[in-house]
Regions:
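Noncatalytic nucleic-acid binding interfaces
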Residues: 470
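Left-handed beta-helix
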Residues: 21-25, 226-427, 432-450, 458, ...
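A residue-level structural signature of the nucleotidyltransferase/glycosyltransferase Rossmann-like core
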Residues: 131, 212, 219-220, 292, ...
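Conserved N-terminal catalytic core of the sugar/cofactor nucleotidyltransferase
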Residues: 16-30, 37-135, 139-145, 151, ...
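Catalytic metal- and UDP-sugar-binding loop of GT-A-like glycosyltransferases, i.e.
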Residues: 31, 134, 428, 473
């Protein structure tokens, strides 16, 4: 399929002019990949950190989407993995943000292919479209300051520059790459002299002492055709293979699914290595509004409100005689109490607890590797399992029976299905359920129940305008999620 055909109906992806500016609107490209290991147990492979609420009630992804909305911005384009597409759509809907599109990567290939795919897609409607590459898992407290910085860089980007945003450093950081800013070329915009790899401590101290050097946040503003030209010059293989995969992309339930076999042939590479470090037309805008990649629990602690002793508390948490400690309870049933702790992070969830030296929380990744080696489900899966129709939570799992809380979004439906090894009992506790059991269809309201015999073809739907919640009791010889035969599914699951 030609890209123009794929994009039919997407003409609002880039508007020509904002009433507040002579520049074209900027299309945010929200990069929503990531495996979610460094902030375990809250972030996991099935639900990585960008979708979790670390610093407020909304997720990092939602905060990123809000940060690049409003005057000067077009509707966003989100790039995400297959398993996260419905999470992205749901979280944007909760923000009241209608995306221009959601592009599905069959597998993660790092940021260069994702950026190339977005540029090719945007160029179909407007080759000179301004696009802002935004990692969806960063924290930027001052949203207006960031928007102002983006608008400062927009004239340079419109003239054919690739504009990055250098973060004013607050410490001699060895965990980030750095940028060297050169002479000013436009108001607030400097030529970029070079990218600097993550330094050792001595070099970081030298960089921190010199005002020319900034942190590299991986944020880029450019025209679509400018980025495509940069790929043509510096990484033509990535561009050509991405173009082939995009030309074979197919619409799927409102998403755009990149061709999986062709996408698997694209070289996995970061956009910094593939293009930016070699390009000669890169500029930098200094950003002083505060930024963190939230790459560790220590970073979460640094960005969180603290008491007079440096303690950051979240959920049902209490600190007694503690200093510089992060205590976070993610369960309404767990009271987390720290006594006499210093420089500690403790995160309690219903199925897992992390206790670590706050300054060594980068080692969390090693802990996840250990859990994976043991095939512990907590390494990958949250207690709450998110699905296209809503979510469920396992309350009790014992020999031959299981109890779940199931939440179904308004208008959503589970697949028409049957089970070989279990029967089920459903009790509605909120909302209205439309229930199919073999040839019978009926409505259930609060406190009503139904029995699903083993082997019966069944489905639950929420025909109402409010969430439907029910308790499901399963009984049988095998209770795994793979005991399912699907006959119909509105989300095209097999």
């Amino acid at each position: 399929m030609l890209l123009g055909e794929v994009c039919s109906g997407w003409s609002d992806l880039t508007s020509e002019n904002d009433i507040m500016s002579d520049l074209p609107l900027i299309t945010p490209v929200l990069l929503c990949g990531g495996s979610g290991t460094r902030l375990w147990p809250l972030s996991r492979k099935s639900y990585p950190k960008q979708f979790a609420p670390f610093l407020g009630e909304e997720s990092l992804f939602q905060e990123a989407a809000r940060r690049v909305s409003g005057s000067g911005f077009a509707a966003p384009l989100a790039v995400t993995g297959d398993g996260f597409r419905f999470i992205v759509a749901e979280q944007l809907d909760h923000c009241g943000i209608r995306p221009a599109g959601i592009l599905i990567e069959p597998e993660g290939r790092n940021t260069a292919p994702a950026a190339a795919a977005a540029a090719l897609l945007l160029a179909q409607t407007n080759p000179q479209a301004l696009m802002l590459l935004v990692p969806a898992d960063h924290a930027i407290p001052d949203a207006q300051a960031f928007r102002d910085a983006v608008m400062t860089g927009a004239p340079a980007a419109a003239e054919g520059q690739i504009v990055t945003f250098g973060i004013q450093p607050t410490r001699a950081e060895t965990g980030y790459g750095w940028l060297e800013a050169g002479a000013e070329t436009l108001p607030g915009v400097n030529a970029l002299e070079r990218f600097i790899e993550k330094p050792d401590q001595a070099k970081a101290e030298t960089l921190f002492a010199d005002d020319r050097y900034l942190w590299n946040a991986g944020l880029f503003l450019t025209r679509a055709d400018t980025l495509i030209a940069a790929f043509e010059e510096h990484a033509p293989d990535i561009l050509n293979d991405t173009r082939a995969a995009m030309e074979a992309a197919q619409p799927d339930l409102g998403f755009l699914r990149i061709d999986a076999p062709l996408w698997g042939q694209v070289r996995a590479e970061s956009i910094d290595y593939a293009v930016m470090e070699q390009a000669q037309n890169v500029s930098v805008v200094r950003f002083t509004g505060g930024w963190s990649d939230l790459g560790s629990w220590e970073a979460v602690w640094q960005e969180s409100p603290q008491d007079g002793s440096g303690n950051a508390l979240a959920g049902l948490s209490t600190a007694i005689g503690c200093e510089n400690t992060l205590l976070r309870s993610e369960s309404d049933e767990i009271e987390l109490v720290g006594i006499g702790l210093k420089n500690v992070v403790a995160v309690a969830m219903r199925d897992a607890v992390l206790v670590a030296d706050l300054t060594d929380s980068q080692s969390v990744r090693r802990a996840v590797d250990t859990l994976n080696a043991r095939k512990a489900k907590q390494a990958v899966q949250l207690p709450v399992d998110h699905r296209p129709w809503g979510w469920f939570e396992k309350l009790i799992l014992a020999d031959r029976f299981q109890v779940k809380r199931i939440h179904v979004h308004p208008g959503a439906a589970l697949s028409l299905q049957s089970h070989v090894h279990r029967s089920e009992h459903w009790i509605v506790v909120a909302g209205t359920a439309k229930v199919t059991v073999d040839d019978e269809v009926r409505l259930l309201t609060e406190n009503q129940s139904v029995y699903i015999p083993l082997g019966a073809v069944h489905r639950m739907e929420n025909p109402g305008k409010v969430p439907m919640v029910l308790i499901e009791v399963q009984t049988g010889t095998y209770l795994g999620e793979d005991d399912i035969i699907r006959y119909e599914d509105i989300y095209s699951r097999s």
